[in-house]
């Protein structure tokens, strides 16, 4: 079977050194570090108190209030990046067979913040199991892919890839193969995480997987240093 040629037609991002492709590339070229002291929560009692956080992102500016009830932070990032990518590709959705456009999106932990908030809310109560109806939809790792498809009406292949730190790479490989093999004409692919939260930092700290050079965040990451 002859395999189809695959090209990248649009890109988008939101990350610790840029909330758009233009800002990201500019800061990347200038050697800007995204590492700093954690601001998402009080990390003073943690062994590692530094992280690379997304900065200057206000979801209320991007999404309507009723939408935010449905989106964990990792899904918010996914929608921001995917929207920029679709716009960058200059797609004319009225001339595209939406049944041939899919989404393969990755997330290693999905909506861990949602899970943490709901469980802590229950634990701090009187034992009555009162959980938000959005708990499960916000938490599971494949909802970001679903939200992207719902926004644009894409009806092609749609699923999430979870393979730890390789999740996004695997998602992009899957997306490429779906096009090469004729299963889809276009795929929105990538990955998103929102891991700077208490259980994630606490868990990785207990594994000694995070730097404790808290006095020098910009130079703390040195994976090959003894």
Region annotations inferred by a language model:
Residues 11, 106-108:
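Structured loops at beta-to-helix junctions and adjacent beta-edge loops in soluble globular domains
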Residues 23, 74-81, 167, 171:
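Generic hydrophobic secondary-structure packing signal
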Residues 40-91, 141-155:
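A glycine- and small-residue-enriched flexible loop/hinge segment at structural boundaries
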Residues 13, 71, 161:
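Generic anion/oxyanion-binding catalytic loop in active/binding sites
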Residues 1-67:
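ACP-dependent fatty acid/polyketide chain-elongation machinery
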Residues 2-3, 19, 30-38, 87-99, ...:
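Acyl-thioester C-C bond-transforming condensing/cleaving domain
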């Amino acid at each position: 079977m002859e395999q189809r040629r695959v090209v990248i037609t649009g890109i988008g991002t939101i990350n610790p050194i840029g909330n758009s492709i233009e800002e990201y590339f500019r800061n990347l070229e200038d050697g800007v570090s995204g590492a700093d002291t954690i601001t998402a929560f009080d990390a003073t009692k943690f062994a590692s108190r530094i992280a690379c956080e997304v900065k200057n992102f206000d979801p209320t500016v991007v999404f309507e209030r009723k939408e935010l009830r449905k989106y964990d932070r990792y899904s918010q990032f996914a929608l921001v990046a995917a929207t920029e990518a679709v716009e960058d590709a200059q797609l004319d959705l009225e001339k595209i067979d939406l049944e041939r456009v899919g989404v393969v999106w990755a997330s290693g932990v999905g909506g861990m913040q949602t899970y943490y908030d709901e469980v802590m809310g229950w634990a701090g109560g009187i034992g009555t199991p009162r959980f938000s109806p959005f708990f499960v939809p916000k938490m599971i790792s494949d909802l970001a892919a679903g939200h992207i498809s719902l926004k644009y009406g894409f009806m092609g292949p749609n699923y999430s890839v979870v393979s730890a730190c390789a999740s996004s790479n695997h998602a992009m490989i899957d997306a490429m193969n779906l096009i090469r093999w004729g299963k889809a004409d276009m795929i929105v692919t990538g990955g998103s995480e929102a891991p700077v939260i208490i259980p994630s930092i606490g868990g990785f700290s207990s594994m000694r997987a995070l730097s404790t050079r808290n006095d020098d965040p910009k130079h703390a990451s040195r994976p090959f240093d003894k």
